């Protein structure tokens, strides 16, 4: 059996020596926090794009427009959950993220924010999977509109045939018919809706509290020797 020292390949030192190293890292952590705060401020200052198209979703209350999803608030966060029309269950990586949504959603309404997930699977599949996972957040189906295509997280058979897809603000190879993302919208006092922000791929890391915990421990995410990141991951009822 490997010892902890060999397994982690970390230097062992005295408490006093460790404190010097820790304070050096703390300086870097504080600088990173300041940079993150500045980046968040810049994000909030991005220009907005008015949403001209009328999107109608299938939701627990029946037909709901994008405007309806604000639920009386001025800000809306939409998570694009990978769950295609012919899929039998939701993406396991999106499920990993979704395990964090309900905790945050206790607090978001108190900051004038509504949260909803959307997928192209029919509502009946979404509701069944939501029940299986024990989630409470609102989930609507975009099966009958272009929402996920317009926000570049769903792709067509033609995209697959050409092996091309526009994702994360760049043209690239086709990967899947569904990809993950998050979009943010604002509604003004007149009822006009604006798109303010979308993020994809590693931009979603900030949502994953479990990864943030793993980033604190000696082995970190421990994914370097896997065939792909998240290979270890299971839906929470499959471990």
Residue map of PLM features:
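Non-globular targeting/processing and membrane-anchoring segments
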Residues: 1-76, 81-111, 128-131, 138, ...
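Catalytic nucleophile loop
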Residues: 109-126
């Amino acid at each position: 059996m490997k010892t902890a020292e060999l397994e982690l390949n970390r230097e062992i030192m005295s408490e006093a020596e460790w404190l010097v190293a820790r304070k050096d890292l703390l300086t870097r952590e504080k600088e990173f926090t300041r940079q993150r705060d500045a980046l968040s401020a810049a994000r909030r200052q991005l220009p907005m794009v008015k949403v001209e198209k009328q999107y109608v979703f299938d939701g627990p209350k029946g037909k709901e427009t994008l405007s309806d999803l604000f639920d009386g608030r001025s800000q809306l966060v939409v998570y694009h959950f990978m769950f295609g029309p012919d899929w039998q269950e939701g993406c396991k990586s999106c499920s990993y993220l979704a395990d964090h949504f309900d905790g945050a959603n206790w607090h978001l309404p108190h900051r004038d924010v509504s949260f909803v997930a959307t997928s192209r699977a029919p509502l009946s599949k979404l509701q069944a999977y939501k029940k299986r996972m024990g989630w409470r957040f609102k989930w609507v189906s975009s099966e009958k509109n272009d929402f996920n295509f317009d926000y570049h997280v769903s792709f067509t058979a033609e995209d697959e045939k050409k092996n091309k897809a526009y994702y994360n603000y760049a043209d690239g190879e086709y990967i899947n018919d569904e990809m993950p993302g998050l979009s943010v919208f604002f509604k003004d006092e007149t009822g006009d809706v604006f798109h303010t922000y979308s993020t994809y791929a590693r931009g979603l890391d900030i949502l994953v509290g479990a990864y943030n915990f793993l980033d604190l421990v000696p082995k970190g995410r421990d994914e370097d020797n896997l065939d792909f990141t998240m290979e270890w991951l299971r839906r929470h009822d499959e471990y």
